[in-house]
From Swiss-Prot:
May be involved in DNA replication and thus regulate cell proliferation. Induction: Down-regulated by sucrose starvation. Expressed in roots, leaves, shoot apical meristem (SAM), flag leaves and panicles. It comes from Oryza sativa subsp. japonica. Belongs to the activator 1 small subunits family. Pfam families: AAA, RCF1-5-like_lid, Rep_fac_C. InterPro entries: AAA+_ATPase, ATPase_AAA_core, DNA_pol3_clamp-load_cplx_C, DNA_Rep/Repair_Clamp_Loader, P-loop_NTPase, Rep_factorC_C, RFC_lid. This is Replication factor C subunit 2. Keywords: ATP-binding, DNA replication, Nucleotide-binding, Nucleus. NCBIfam families: PRK00440.1. CDD domains: AAA, HLD_clamp_RFC.
Length: 339
């Protein structure tokens, strides 16, 4: 099947819910926010939970329902805190926008309340100094500006900020919810996706609906309307399951040379070792033939190797270390001594 003609619009945006009530699998959040929207009197808000569960979508839907398309750009400031997270941004861009007062005239049937909204995406990556500076800005301009903080880890938001917000937890999306949404997009775009491919997409996206939709669009552009599990794995960067199982099998052989050869093959094929470690962890944890004590030793080494990779260590040496420790754990050999 020939690839589909590329669309200029990402499907993540094309199929993003425009109203709060359309956000999937967040019934409690939707119920509370729908009631709050009827009065248009919103507090500062803090949305937290795993990626791809609808946090940003909900914030944008609230803003759109309050102001409509005409006033949206002048009343809403969106900032990705991963890029704009320093104290200077708080002192200039955010403060300047927050300080401007606005009217409350209804326009086009939208409530248009007398305040603006600042949406800070990935707020948990803001520096502590920037968050402290933001606290003062929130207090000073609370009558004319509302802040929406969006983060994955609420523990990284300082308590003085978190205590000033209404907190909403976004639950991880179930496989059924993700599958229903993906099948809806497939029907709209004329795609054919069998049950195995659908299960694969759910697995490689790890409950992140945004990531799943992106993988689906990438596969459609490259492989056409009929998409297989192999197609999805190739566009996602996930490592084929047989590669991960081959590494474990080489470790189970008890032969270091066999494991070393498998490690060399993995490095030569260019697979990212950090991704391999993540998938290897899943295989180890779910293995029925490995005792818990041995699993614990292997998982400890996987965590250490992952940390070393983040710090810039050599991929080959780290993967070889993982393989050798896995052999020692599987055959109850003594652990290596660290001096």
């Amino acid at each position: 099947m020939a690839p589909l003609v590329p669309s200029s619009q990402p499907w993540v945006e094309k199929y993003r819910p425009r109203q709060v009530k359309d956000v999937a699998h967040q019934e409690e959040v939707v119920r509370v926010l729908t009631t709050t929207l009827q009065t248009a009197d919103l507090p500062h808000m803090l949305f937290y939970g795993p990626p791809g569960t609808g946090k940003t979508t909900t914030a944008l839907a609230i803003a759109y329902q309050l102001y409509g398309p005409e006033l949206y750009k002048s009343r809403v400031l969106e900032l990705n805190a991963s890029d704009d997270r320093g104290i200077n941004v708080v002192r200039t861009k955010i403060k300047d926008f927050a300080a401007v007062a606005v009217g409350s005239a209804r326009k086009g049937g939208y409530p248009c309340p007398p305040y603006k909204i600042i949406i800070l995406d990935e707020a948990d990556s803001m520096t502590e100094d920037a968050q402290n500076a933001l606290r003062r800005t929130m207090e000073t301009y609370s009558k004319v500006t509302r802040f929406f903080f969006i983060c994955n880890y609420i523990s990284r938001i300082i308590e003085p900020l978190a205590s000033r917000c209404a907190k909403f937890r976004f639950k991880p999306l179930s496989e059924e919810v993700m599958s229903n949404r993906i099948l809806h997009i497939c029907n709209e775009e004329g795609l054919s996706l069998d049950a195995q491919a659908l299960a694969t997409l759910s697995t490689i996206s790890n409950g992140d609906l945004r990531r799943a939709i992106t993988y689906l669009q990438s596969a459609a552009r490259l492989f056409g309307s009929s998409i297989s599990s192999t197609d999805l794995i190739s566009v996602s960067g996930a490592i084929p399951e047989d590669v991960v199982k081959s590494l474990l099998a080489s470790c189970k052989s008890g032969e270091f040379d066999v494991a070393n050869k498998e490690v060399n093959n993995i490095i030569a094929d260019g697979y990212p070792v950090s991704q391999l470690i993540s998938q290897f962890l899943d295989v180890i944890v779910n293995a029925d033939d490995i005792p818990d004590e041995q699993k614990a030793r292997i998982c400890k080494k996987l965590g250490e190797a992952d940390k070393c990779l983040v710090d810039g260590a050599d991929e080959y040496l780290q993967l070889l270390d993982v393989a050798s420790e896995t052999i020692r754990a599987l055959f109850d050999m003594p652990q290596t001594l660290v001096f």
